[in-house]
Amino acid sequence: MSKIIILRGNSGCGKSTAAKALQKRIGNGTFLISQDYVRREMLGEKTGQHNQTVSLLKNLVMYGYQNCEVSILDGILSTGTYDDLFNLIAELYAGQTFAYYFDIPFEETLRRHNQKSYAHEVGEIQLRKWWREKDLLKNISEKMICKEMNTDDIVEMIYADITR
């Protein structure tokens, strides 16, 4: 039965790093869907434009459900904008959805962001503008990831959750 792992949270909190490490840990055939990559690289949409992104993410999630044992979806994935996507996930992956919210304080998120090679492209003012405090899903339960957890801790916790 197909499973989906959802990694959500504010920009710069470590979701994509954890998603890539988790894909490597789970192994061959693990389908990684990155909201940022789909929006910026595949579709060329700017921040605030999500018309095509939501539709393509829904198609990718369906592909993962039909063809992959495990799919990982990572991104900011704000409630409201992506509610249709989460409704689809709740329906398709009933009982096989593993969702995590990166509940990282802004100061820690900014510190992590500033360590990235592309940190100069997006500054503190923009990060604050994008910030959404505890933007939790309404129809899918999310396990919280706190700032004390490193990437290895996160990966091993999620791996244990999906292999029980």
Question: How does the language model describe each region?
Answer:
Residues Q115-M157:
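Small-molecule kinase domains that catalyze NTP-dependent phosphoryl transfer to phosphate-bearing small molecules
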